[in-house]
């Protein structure tokens, strides 16, 4: 595909190149990623329905988990439809549409960064201060944290989008990614994007490194607390759960940090797309499995839901 400049004319749309350099795999990719998208929606919807329908799951840990699942559904849905379109035909998106996609995806991803930190802190309180936990994480506290994470995401990315919206784009209009990636998007501006870039860098450092540091600190203290428990099945289960949670969290935060805090670390655009898949597709796919893997309460609620559905089908 030839990339051409449009000169000094203001462009009205962008072309998302996606995986344009391997057209022979487009149909296979379409099938695979459609299946993955369906699994993401179903897996996360089951978690939400289980938490809403089961009185036993009306606890902070599960309220946070349901919100995480909702975030995963929304921000994956902000990206994947255009990616799937690119496997079948040339995917175009208007400048306004690109701004909207970046705002929705960025806001939800920022909210997820903050929510993951809240979830780690919640587990720290539950494990290290079990007697005081009901007071430390009461209904007003955990609902306030949920609302704060959502609002913070939209406020932070709303500021960035307001700055980007002032830029002028006059070509080229090709984005070598499967979604409107911020760095590539503002890199195409023919007006000075430095204010938007510096602002994004500062906000990214704040919204990524601080929550990630809180997560690492929380899990470190959890590990110390677990080490005091006599060796046995419960201790092994706790370590297994912590390690699986950290694996998902590290993948999510690590790829975002590479993109928005140290973008020069990615020298290959193909590698950039692979990293993008990790936090746009892989993490939302595995979050429901990882966070409910050893949870009997969630398993019981899910079995109840599936049995009800099966009974209704038979009737």
Swiss-Prot record:
Gene Ontology CC, one term: plasma membrane
Q: Which UniProt keywords apply?
A: Cell membrane, Disulfide bond, G-protein coupled receptor, Glycoprotein, Membrane, Olfaction, Receptor, Sensory transduction, Transducer, Transmembrane, Transmembrane helix
| Name of the protein this chain belongs to | Olfactory receptor 11A1
Q: Which organism is it from?
A: Homo sapiens
Enumerate the Cytoplasmic topological stretches.
49-56, 122-140, 219-238, 294-315
Q: Which GO molecular function annotations are given, in alphabetical order?
A: G protein-coupled receptor activity; olfactory receptor activity
Superkingdom of this protein's organism? Eukaryota
Per its UniProt record, what InterPro entries does this chain match? GPCR_Rhodpsn (IPR000276), GPCR_Rhodpsn_7TM (IPR017452), Olfact_rcpt (IPR000725), Olfactory_GPCR1 (IPR050939)
Biological role: Odorant receptor.
Q: Which residues are glycosylated?
A: 8
The family assignment reads: Belongs to the G-protein coupled receptor 1 family.
Give disulfide pairs as residue numbers.
98-190
Q: How does it sit in the membrane?
A: Multi-pass membrane protein
Per the record, what ranges lie on the membrane's Extracellular side?
1-27, 78-100, 162-198, 260-272
- Subcellular location per the Swiss-Prot or TrEMBL entry: Cell membrane
Q: Which residues cross the membrane?
A: 28-48, 57-77, 101-121, 141-161, 199-218, 239-259, 273-293
Q: Record's Gene3D superfamilies?
A: Rhodopsin 7-helix transmembrane proteins
């Amino acid at each position: 595909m030839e990339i051409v400049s449009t000169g000094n004319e203001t462009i009205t749309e962008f072309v998302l190149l996606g995986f344009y350099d391997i057209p022979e795999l487009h149909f296979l990719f379409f099938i695979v990623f459609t299946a993955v998208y369906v699994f993401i929606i179903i897996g996360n919807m089951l978690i939400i329905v289980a938490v809403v329908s089961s009185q036993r799951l009306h606890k902070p840990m599960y309220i946070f988990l349901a919100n995480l699942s909702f975030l995963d559904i929304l921000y994956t849905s902000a990206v994947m439809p255009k990616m799937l379109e690119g496997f079948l035909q040339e995917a175009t998106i208007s400048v306004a549409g690109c701004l909207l996609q970046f705002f929705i995806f960025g806001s939800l991803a920022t909210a997820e960064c903050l929510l993951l930190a809240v979830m780690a802190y919640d587990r720290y309180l539950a494990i290290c201060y079990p007697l005081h936990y009901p007071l430390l994480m009461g209904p007003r506290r955990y609902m306030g944290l949920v609302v704060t994470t959502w609002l913070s995401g939209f406020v932070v990315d709303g500021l960035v989008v307001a700055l980007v919206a002032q830029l002028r784009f006059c070509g080229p209009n090709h984005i070598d990614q499967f979604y409107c990636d911020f760095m590539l998007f503002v890199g195409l501006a023919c007006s000075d994007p430095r204010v938007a870039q510096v602002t994004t860098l500062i906000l990214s450092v704040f919204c990524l490194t601080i929550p990630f540091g809180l997560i690492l600190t929380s899990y470190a203290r959890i590990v110390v607390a677990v080490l005091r428990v006599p060796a046995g099945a419960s201790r092994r289960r706790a370590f297994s759960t912590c390690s699986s949670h950290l694996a998902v969290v590290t993948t999510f935060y690590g790829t975002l940090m590479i993109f928005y805090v140290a973008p020069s670390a990615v020298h290959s655009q193909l590698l950039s797309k692979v990293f993008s898949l990790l936090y746009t597709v892989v993490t939302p796919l595995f979050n429901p499995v990882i966070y409910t893997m050893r949870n009997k309460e969630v398993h019981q609620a899910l079995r109840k839901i599936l049995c009800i559905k099966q009974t209704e089908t038979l009737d």
